[in-house]
């Protein structure tokens, strides 16, 4: 059963809030970054990737974020526009802040890492005054991402967006997206992530991310079921806990659980899997699919993206996912 109810007759299906950055993916693989000489530039940031994936699948998508007043900022907004994402609520930073950069290292399909530059970044300067209630109430769903909670004023902007969403019956998806380098401490992270999760209808994260959120609770022993049930006393209707190559499990408030598998593919790199999973999973739910079917879409989308060099550029269309699912081996 799909427990989500989306308001009809709204111009946007999904509005995402948060990080807009640039990925620089290594062109030379099977070697460390010290030996990498060239990189290819892509738009990045988890909420950006999810929005791009959703738009490519056909959802009417908008974005609330902030970009730097330079070539990188213009590259980001131009790319979003090219992918039919509304950018009316992406102001330009005027303080001299820069675009966050993510350099990727692909030593092997199993050994990938990311080097992040996140000092003085424009996306964390999003101010609450730049969050429009009228814009949010025009959407069926809102996606928030944990990285945007790391610092003020972006933190307050996200919580204001959450309040507007709750006020206007906008379904809230929370992608945990934990990046430790942006935060001062795990305690700070846990506090704000928990506050955001309490206001969310769907929470999506890895087992490790949920473990981080539970560190202040002094659980003697936690597991996926314990984690999910904790959130059902708040707004959550669906909690998805991802286990990498072992697939994912979705729990619902009515006590059901659904296990999602993966599709075999030739893996190039591991990053991008979570964002592509989320975009297709959200799309499936918004199309009225049952949770297991939406999870299959997410798993197929993730397998496609990890076989490609980019994240945002590799986000598949609905036809590409369908064609892939017809031929790829599914492991449940």
UniProtKB/Swiss-Prot annotation:
Catalysed reaction equations from the record? 5-dehydro-2-deoxy-D-gluconate + ATP = 6-phospho-5-dehydro-2-deoxy-D-gluconate + ADP + H(+)
InterPro entries on file:
Carboh/pur_kinase_PfkB_CS, DKG_kinase_firmi, Myo_inos_IolC, Myo_inos_IolC-like_sf, PfkB_Carbo_kinase, PfkB_dom, Ribokinase-like
Q: Which residues form the signal peptide?
A: none
Asked if the Swiss-Prot or TrEMBL record annotates the protein with the keyword Nucleotide-binding, the reply is yes
What does the entry give for GO biological process? inositol catabolic process
Pathway linked to the protein: Polyol metabolism; myo-inositol degradation into acetyl-CoA; acetyl-CoA from myo-inositol: step 5/7
Q: Name one GO molecular function term.
A: 5-dehydro-2-deoxygluconokinase activity
**Which leading EC class covers this enzyme?**
transferase
EC assignment = 2.7.1.92
Origin, by domain of life? Bacteria
Q: Give UniProt keywords alphabetically.
A: ATP-binding, Kinase, Nucleotide-binding, Transferase
Q: Which Pfam families match?
A: PfkB (PF00294)
PROSITE patterns associated with the record: PFKB_KINASES_2
Extract the PANTHER family matched here.
Answer: 5-DEHYDRO-2-DEOXYGLUCONOKINASE, HEXOKINASE FAMILY MEMBER
Q: Which family does it belong to?
A: Belongs to the carbohydrate kinase PfkB family.
**Cited function:** Catalyzes the phosphorylation of 5-dehydro-2-deoxy-D-gluconate (2-deoxy-5-keto-D-gluconate or DKG) to 6-phospho-5-dehydro-2-deoxy-D-gluconate (DKGP).
Q: What is this protein called?
A: 5-dehydro-2-deoxygluconokinase
Native species: Bacillus anthracis
What is the organism lineage in this UniProt record? Bacteria, Bacillati, Bacillota, Bacilli, Bacillales
Which gene produces this protein? Answer: iolC
């Amino acid at each position: 059963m799909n427990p989500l109810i989306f308001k009809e007759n709204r111009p946007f299906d999904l509005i995402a809030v948060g990080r807009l950055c640039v990925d620089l993916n290594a062109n030379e693989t099977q070697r460390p970054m010290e030996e990498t000489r060239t990189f290819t530039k892509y738009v990045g940031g988890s909420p950006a990737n999810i929005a791009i994936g959703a738009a490519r699948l056909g959802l009417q998508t908008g974005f609330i974020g902030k970009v730097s007043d330079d070539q990188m900022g213009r590259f980001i907004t131009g790319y979003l526009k090219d992918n039919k994402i509304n950018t009316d609520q992406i102001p330009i930073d005027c303080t001299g802040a820069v675009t966050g950069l993510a350099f990727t290292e692909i030593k092997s399909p199993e050994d990938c890492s990311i080097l992040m530059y996140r000092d003085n970044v424009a996306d964390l300067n999003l101010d609450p005054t730049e969050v429009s209630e009228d814009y949010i109430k025009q959407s069926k769903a809102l996606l928030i991402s944990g990285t945007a909670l790391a610092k003020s004023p972006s933190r307050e902007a996200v919580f204001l967006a959450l309040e507007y969403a709750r006020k206007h019956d906008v379904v809230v998806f929370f992608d945990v997206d934990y990046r430790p380098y942006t935060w001062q401490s795990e305690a700070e992270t846990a506090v704000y992530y928990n506050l955001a999760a309490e206001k969310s209808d769907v929470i999506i994260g890895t087992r490790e991310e949920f473990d981080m959120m539970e560190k202040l609770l002094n659980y003697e022993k936690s597991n996926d079921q314990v984690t999910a049930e904790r959130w059902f006393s708040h707004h959550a209707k669906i909690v998805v806990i991802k286990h990498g190559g072992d697939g994912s499990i979705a729990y619902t408030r009515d006590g059901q659980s659904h296990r999602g598998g993966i599709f075999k593919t030739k893996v190039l790199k591991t990053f991008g899997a979570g964002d592509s999973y989320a975009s297709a999973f959200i799309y499936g739910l918004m199309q009225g699919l049952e949770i297991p079917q939406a999870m299959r879409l997410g798993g197929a989308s993730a397998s496609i993206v990890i076989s490609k060099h980019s994240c945002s550029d590799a986000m598949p269309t609905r036809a590409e996912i369908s064609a892939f699912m017809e031929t790829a081996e599914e492991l449940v």
